[in-house]
Amino acid sequence: MNASSFSRRWICPAVAVFGGCALLAGCSSGHQTTSASNSTNTSVSNASIAQQGPQAGFMWSASEQTLRPILGVPGSSQFGAPMVTPGLYVAGGASTRSGVALLEDRAGQISLMSAATGQLQPLAGVHVSGAAQFVFSPSGLNAVIFVPGQGGALLLTGLGATDANSVQVQGLNSAAGLQSAAVSDLGQVVGASGTSPATLMLLTGNAAPVATLGGFGGIVFLPGGNALLAVDSANNAVELMPGNGAAPQIFTSNALRAPFAVAASQDGTTAVVANGGDDSVVRLDLTNAANQMRIPCTCKPDRLTPLAGNAVFALTGPGTSTAWAVDAAATVPHTLFIPAMVKQ
């Protein structure tokens, strides 16, 4: 699907404030929309998740097609009951930081959910064609939605609002199909196309190339600004692009082995990189390039999903076997396990 057809399918490529659904003349979502105020709550329980105690995070379970909370605190936690009826949604994602979740139903409708209360509201006029991926900014107040391989994306801002009508949506074009994307707390979006090499493109403002990587190993923004971390899997390197016109900083390490994902601490001082070449992650001190540490895991990392804490990230997802996480900010960085979830 090309960029223009993508934009028409999703929403007009301009900011729209839901409620009025103000689209530019000549633009159309191509769908009959449902007002958020008429939404049906399909969460499995009206009880507040917060009443179950502290949460270490929220994670989408692809095998069950539902969202689950991680109850407890890092190091002493377990998966809670499904937050939405399993099978009603085909894709989803959540921000532990903001307590916001986004879900895609079988018709491609995107809904906004408060992970704390379970309140679920469809976003009027926001549809996708295909199983979407949801990437949140560090604060969790912005998100970018894209379907891998399609040439376009949606930028959602104002996710901290309790009313879905206050969420703003902007359609973004990409000249090539996206395989990944990242969004900053300031609303800047960078998309990645291709694998070896991979091209990074700024999708907001004056769209332009950002960088070319020998191999794509992940991108993420640091909290609070537009500084971007980009991992080159072919050269086992991490590039920090300040976002202010200054020259990028390159981090290399013998511990980096075919990296495929990167995450940043909430204080912006630490990067965590997941290796594809062995069962480990690497902690990089962004203030001192010499301060590096390889953290082995008995698991095979397949993600870096932010959980509660400064630098706590899930390494594997919910399933019938033990899930794993890493606390990279601890005095002695270490991995943590989350017991296998119990089918509900």
Identify the meaning behind each predicted range.
Residues 28-31:
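Bacterial signal peptide processing site
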Residues 46-47, 87-98, 127-140, 173-184, ...:
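Repeated scaffold domains used in trafficking and secretory/extracellular systems
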Residues 60-63, 95-96, 102-106, 137-138, ...:
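Conserved beta-strand positions in repeat-built beta-propeller and related beta-rich domains
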Residues 23-26:
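C-terminal motif of bacterial Sec signal peptides marking the signal peptidase cleavage site
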Residues 77-84, 119-126, 164-172, 206-212, ...:
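A short beta-strand motif characteristic of beta-propeller blades
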Residues 73-75, 114-118, 158-162, 202-206, ...:
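Short loop/turn segments that connect beta-strands within beta-propeller blades
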Residues 64-68, 108-113, 150-157, 196-202, ...:
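Structural motif
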Residues 44-72, 78-96:
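Beta-strand-rich domains and repeat architectures in extracellular enzymes and scaffolds
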